[in-house]
């Protein structure tokens, strides 16, 4: 097995009746990422050959059921960083949400309005909703955020509430945000909101689905000033 990081991460593998557990161990060592195997996969013998495939297509050839947990740094142009790879048995179900993505704290959104999710019935109600300073909706894997002079932590907490995921506010900077973002993937939305967000995602390669697991508003990186 060879793993190259340049120009982009790519994997080559030639295995002839190799134990899947040994292939997974080698992959984990090369990628420096934990790899988890389903019980039935441990002693399975595999024969695979491919060259210079990017991560996800390579993983799909290695297992019928694959999940990958990623960390996305919105301030970086680097591709999402894999945190854990799961080669599971067909009927094993999904890994626990906290298998590799864990957090010590969670911030909560406290609101007075309990009518979220109720469609406005009249034109007046629709107009009232449209005039609200912060609106977040998530439909068909697309996120919409409309914010008028709203603090960034509040926007992220509202996104977390809509997605049903924990949000960790570590940066108390109350930067005020105006946003008009319609029907984009979660990753694209948070990239537009701030460079200090860490988004944790899970890719289900079998079903070609991606979902958010956790949002963190991190402290901005400390920049060291160079003397002229």
Protein language model annotation of sequence segments:
Residues 1-228:
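N-terminal targeting/assembly segments of extracytoplasmic apparatus and virion spike/baseplate proteins
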């Amino acid at each position: 097995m060879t793993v190259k990081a340049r120009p982009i991460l790519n994997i080559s593998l030639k295995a002839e009746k190799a134990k899947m557990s040994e292939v997974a161990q080698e992959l984990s060592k090369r990628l420096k990422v934990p790899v988890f195997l389903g019980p039935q996969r441990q002693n399975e013998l595999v024969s695979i050959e491919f060259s210079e495939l990017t991560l996800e297509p390579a993983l799909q050839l290695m297992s019928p059921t694959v999940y990958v947990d990623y960390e996305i740094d919105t301030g970086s142009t680097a591709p999402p960083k894999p945190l854990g790879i799961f080669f599971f048995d067909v009927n094993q179900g999904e890994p626990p949400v906290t298998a590799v993505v864990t957090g010590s704290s969670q911030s909560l959104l406290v609101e007075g309005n309990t009518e979220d999710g109720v469609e406005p019935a009249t034109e007046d109600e629709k107009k009232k909703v449209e005039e609200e300073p912060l609106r977040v909706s998530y439909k068909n894997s697309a996120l919409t955020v409309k914010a008028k002079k709203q603090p960034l932590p509040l926007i992220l907490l509202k996104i977390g509430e809509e997605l049903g995921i924990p949000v960790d506010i570590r940066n108390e900077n109350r930067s005020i945000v105006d946003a008009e973002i319609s029907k984009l993937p979660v990753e694209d939305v948070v990239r537009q909101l701030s460079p200090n967000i860490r988004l944790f995602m899970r890719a289900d390669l079998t079903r070609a689905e991606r979902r958010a697991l956790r949002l963190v508003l991190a402290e901005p990186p400390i920049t060291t000033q160079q003397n002229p």
